[in-house]
C-alpha cells in the first residue's frame, strides 16, 4: 500500500513487479517492467509494468518515461505522458508503458523505464467567453525568450 497522507492510501495489486516505493526527496515513483522485451525499429509494444492500482477518489496518476529511457533504450512513450484516472482500478487494469522502438533493443525484466506521480484531479473549470484578454502580448509558440 502507498500512503498519500495520514489518511489516504493506494491499494496496489502486484502481479509481477517488485514493491514500489517513493524514494526520499523524489516526487516521482519508478516502475519496473514485468517482462523481457525485444523490439525492432518501428515496432510498437505495450510493456506491462506488473501491477494494478486503485487510486482514491479525486486523484489521478501521470506516467512518463525516465529521463534516461530514450538514451539507453531508444524507445519513446507513444502518448507522451499517460494519464491514469481513478476509474482504471480493477484487478485486470494493469499499468502499461506504450513503447515505440527507434532502434533494435532488448530490455531485461525488472528494468526501470518509466515513473509516475499521483496528483489531485483538476477542479471543474468554468470558461468565460470575453472579447479581449488583459495580459500583454508574449509572442508566439517558442518565442517568449527571444
Please name every model-derived segment.
Residues 1-146:
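DUTPase catalytic domain/fold
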Amino acid at each position: 500500500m502507498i500512503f498519500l497522507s495520514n489518511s489516504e492510501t493506494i491499494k496496489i495489486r502486484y502481479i509481477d513487479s517488485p514493491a514500489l516505493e517513493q524514494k526520499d526527496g523524489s516526487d516521482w515513483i519508478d516502475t519496473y517492467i514485468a517482462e523481457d522485451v525485444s523490439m525492432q525499429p518501428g515496432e510498437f509494444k505495450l510493456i506491462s509494468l506488473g501491477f494494478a492500482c486503485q487510486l482514491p477518489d479525486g486523484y489521478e496518476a501521470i506516467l512518463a518515461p525516465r529521463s534516461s529511457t530514450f538514451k539507453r533504450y531508444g524507445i519513446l512513450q507513444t502518448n507522451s505522458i499517460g494519464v491514469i484516472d481513478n476509474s482504471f482500478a480493477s484487478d485486470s487494469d494493469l499499468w502499461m508503458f506504450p513503447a515505440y522502438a527507434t532502434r533494435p533493443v532488448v530490455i531485461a525484466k525488472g528494468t526501470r523505464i518509466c515513473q509516475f506521480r499521483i496528483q489531485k484531479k483538476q477542479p471543474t473549470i468554468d470558461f468565460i467567453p470575453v472579447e479581449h484578454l488583459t495580459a500583454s502580448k508574449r509572442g508566439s509558440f517558442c518565442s517568449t525568450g527571444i
